[in-house]
Curated annotation (Swiss-Prot):
<dbReference type="Pfam" id="PF08692">
    <property type="entry name" value="Pet20"/>
</dbReference>
<keyword id="KW-0496">Mitochondrion</keyword>
<dbReference type="InterPro" id="IPR014804">
    <property type="entry name" value="Pet20-like"/>
</dbReference>
<feature type="region of interest" description="Disordered">
    <location>
        <begin position="29"/>
        <end position="61"/>
    </location>
</feature>
<dbReference type="GO" id="GO:0090144">
    <property type="term" value="P:mitochondrial nucleoid organization"/>
</dbReference>
<protein>
    <recommendedName>
        <fullName>MIOREX complex component 6</fullName>
    </recommendedName>
</protein>
<dbReference type="GO" id="GO:0005759">
    <property type="term" value="C:mitochondrial matrix"/>
</dbReference>
<feature type="compositionally biased region" description="Basic and acidic residues">
    <location>
        <begin position="39"/>
        <end position="58"/>
    </location>
</feature>
<keyword id="KW-0809">Transit peptide</keyword>
<comment type="function">
    <text>Component of MIOREX complexes, large expressome-like assemblies of ribosomes with factors involved in all the steps of post-transcriptional gene expression.</text>
</comment>
<feature type="transit peptide" description="Mitochondrion">
    <location>
        <begin position="1"/>
        <end position="34"/>
    </location>
</feature>
<comment type="subunit">
    <text>Associates with the mitochondrial ribosome.</text>
</comment>
<dbReference type="GO" id="GO:1901858">
    <property type="term" value="P:regulation of mitochondrial DNA metabolic process"/>
</dbReference>
C-alpha cells in the first residue's frame, strides 16, 4: 500500500517532486549468506531489531548553483541562462519557498513520506469507490477551450437549477441526488448543442460539460462551470462544501517551514503526506559511525543514538576479538606477518614507479589486516576460493590510491596498459603463494557441523559450515513441502509455519572458534 501511495503522489504532484542524482555509495546492515562447498559463511541471530540503511549523499561544490526549473543547471557568471531560468519559473512553485536557486550544502531533494495504512482494516481499504487510497481531491485548471464564452456555464446551470428538487431539512440524509444533477446537465448541454454537433466532424465533437467527475481516482472538480456561480447557490449544492480559511497573523521574524505539507481533507484517514529533504535528514544512522561531534550537535535522536551505540560496541568487540586471536595464537600472528611482508614488497614497487613519474617519495602506511579464520578449520575448495577472493580485495583496497594515481599520470595508453598488467600479474603471484602457505596450521575434529564466530553486526553471529551435506539436508531436504510438528513437554508445539526451506527437527553440532583453536587436534 505504501508503494502504491508513493507512485500516486509522484504521478499527480509533479511540481513538488524533484529528482537528483545520488551516489551509489551505500552502507548496509544485512545478513550475509555466502554459499560454497563446505566453506559457506552465514549470519544468524535475532533479526527482529530494525535495521537502518542510509545513503552517502555527498555535497555539491559551492561554485555550482542549480535552478530548480526542470533540469536547468546555472553556473556563476552565466547571466543569459540565469535570466531564462527566472522567466521560466512559475509563481505557483511553492516547493522551494520562492527560492530560484540554491547552492552548496543548501541543495534540496524532496521525497514524499507516506503514512502507514496498518491501522485501516482490509475491508475498508479494499472497498473501491469509498476509499481511493491516498489519491487526493484535485482542484486545478480543467481542459476547456480558450474561446468559451464567459457566463455560458452559469446560464446552463441557471436553466437546470429550478428543476432540481431540494430535499426537506427534516430528512436524515439531507443530501441532493447528485445523479439527477449530472443527468440534467448532460441533457441541457446536448439539447443546446445538438445542431452544431451534427454539422461538425466527429473529431471536433465536444463532450457535455459535467461540473465534477467521480471515479476511483478521486473527485476532479472542473473550474469553469462554477466560476461565475454565486456562493449562496454553491452552498446549497452537495457534495460541495466550502472551507473557511482562517488567516493567522504571523510575526515578521517567524521561522519559515523547512518542509512542505499538503493537506487533503479526509476525516477518516490521516492523509497528510510530508515532503522530506534527504540532504538534511538528521536521522541517518550509518553516515559517520566515528563522529567526534557531541550528540547535541550531530542531531541524533535518543532511539537512533542507542542503536548507534550498539553498533559501535558490536564492531569494537569484533575487532577486539580479532586482535586477541592474533596475540593469543602464534600461528595466526605468523601468517599475518607473512601477508604483511608480501604487501610491503608490492608497496616498494609502486613507490619506485611513483617516484620515477613525479620525482616524489611516498610511504604507503600499512593497515593491519586480519585474515579469514575459517581457513584454519576447513580445507574445502569453496573455502579456498573465498580465501583467495578475500586476499585480492584486501590487496586492492590497500594499493588503490597510489595505483590509480600512477595510472592517471601515465599519458601513453600503451605504458598504462603495460603497468596495469604488471601489477595484476604480481598480485596474482602473491595470492597463489599465500593460498599455498596459509594456513600454516589446520585444526580438525569429527562430528562438528559448523563453527560460530562473533560478528560485527549487533545481535548476529557468523557460521562457518564444515559439512556441506549437513547444510544441504538442513535447508534443502526432501521433506521441505511437508508440515512437521515437534512438541515440547506437551505445552509448546513448533511447526514450519510457512517457512519453505527449513526442515524440523534440526540438530546442529556447533562449537565456538576459540574452542577449536584450544581443544581440537591439529597438524602443520
Amino acid at each position: 500500500m505504501e508503494h502504491q501511495a508513493l507512485r500516486r503522489l509522484v504521478l499527480y504532484c509533479p511540481n513538488f517532486i524533484r529528482r537528483g542524482a545520488l551516489r551509489q555509495n551505500m552502507t548496509r546492515v544485512s545478513c550475509r549468506h555466502m554459499s560454497g562447498k563446505g566453506g559457506g559463511r552465514d549470519e544468524k541471530g535475532d533479526c527482529n531489531e530494525e535495521k537502518d540503511s542510509s545513503k552517502d549523499l555527498g555535497r555539491v561544490p559551492s561554485k555550482m548553483k542549480r535552478a530548480y526549473d526542470g533540469e536547468t543547471v546555472i553556473k556563476e557568471g552565466d547571466s543569459h541562462a540565469e535570466s531564462l531560468a527566472q522567466q521560466g519559473k512559475q509563481p505557483t512553485d511553492l516547493a522551494y519557498n520562492s527560492r530560484s536557486k540554491i547552492s552548496g550544502s543548501n541543495l534540496h531533494l524532496l521525497v514524499p513520506r507516506v503514512a502507514s495504512t496498518d491501522y485501516i482494516s482490509n475491508k475498508e481499504v479494499h472497498t473501491e469507490g469509498l476509499f481511493a487510497g491516498y489519491r487526493p481531491l484535485f482542484l486545478g485548471n480543467s481542459g476547456f477551450p480558450s474561446d468559451a464564452r464567459k457566463g455560458k456555464n452559469f446560464h446552463e446551470l441557471d436553466d437546470v437549477l429550478p428543476n432540481i428538487q431540494v430535499v426537506d431539512a427534516s430528512e436524515k440524509d439531507g443530501k441532493l441526488n447528485v445523479q439527477e444533477i449530472i443527468e440534467d446537465l448532460q441533457r441541457t448541454s446536448l439539447r443546446e448543442s445538438i445542431h452544431s454537433m451534427e454539422q461538425l466532424p466527429s473529431s471536433h465533437k465536444r463532450k457535455p460539460v459535467i461540473p465534477w467527475d467521480a471515479s476511483i481516482s478521486g473527485m476532479v472538480y472542473n473550474d469553469m462551470p462554477f466560476k461565475y456561480v454565486p456562493k449562496n447557490i454553491i452552498l446549497k449544492m452537495k457534495p460541495f462544501k466550502l472551507l473557511r480559511i482562517e488567516r493567522k497573523s504571523q510575526a515578521k521574524n517567524a521561522r519559515k517551514p523547512t518542509m512542505i505539507k499538503l493537506q487533503f481533507h479526509n476525516r477518516r484517514i490521516n492523509d497528510t503526506p510530508e515532503l522530506v529533504n534527504l540532504y538534511h535528514n538528521k536521522s541517518r544512522l550509518h553516515e559517520s559511525l566515528y563522529n567526534t561531534k557531541p550528540l547535541q550537535e550531530s542531531g541524533y535522536s535518543s532511539a537512533n543514538t542507542s542503536k548507534r551505540q550498539k553498533m559501535l560496541k558490536a564492531r569494537s568487540d569484533f575487532e577486539h576479538k580479532q586482535k586477541n586471536y592474533a596475540y593469543k595464537h602464534t600461528f595466526i600472528k605468523n601468517d599475518q606477518e607473512l601477508f604483511r611482508n608480501e604487501l610491503t614488497k608490492l608497496n616498494k614497487i609502486l613507490a619506485r614507479e611513483f617516484k620515477k613519474l613525479t620525482k616524489l617519495s611516498i610511504h604507503n602506511e600499512f593497515k593491519r589486516e586480519h585474515l579469514p579464520l575459517a581457513v584454519y578449520v576447513s580445507k574445502s575448495k569453496g573455502t579456498k576460493k573465498l580465501f583467495r577472493r578475500s586476499l585480492k580485495m584486501k590487496i586492492m583496497d590497500h594499493i588503490y590510491p597510489v595505483y590509480t594515481t600512477i595510472l592517471s599520470t601515465l599519458t601513453n595508453s600503451r605504458d598504462s596498459k603495460k603497468f596495469e598488467n604488471k601489477i595484476k600479474a604480481y598480485i596474482e603471484k602473491i595470492i597463489v603463494r599465500l593460498s599455498d602457505e596459509v594456513p600454516s596450521t589446520y585444526f580438525f575434529q569429527d562430528g562438528v557441523d559448523c563453527i560460530i564466530q562473533p560478528s560485527p553486526i549487533h545481535n548476529f553471529k557468523r557460521m562457518h559450515w564444515l559439512r556441506y551435506t549437513k547444510r544441504h539436508n538442513t535447508f534443502w531436504g526432501r521433506t521441505i513441502h511437508k508440515d512437521v510438528q515437534v512438541s515440547f513437554n506437551d505445552k509448546y508445539v513448533v511447526t514450519r509455519s510457512g517457512v519453505r526451506y527449513t526442515r524440523y527437527p534440526t540438530n546442529l553440532n556447533t562449537q565456538l572458534l576459540e574452542t577449536a583453536f584450544e581443544e581440537w587436534d591439529y597438524y602443520e
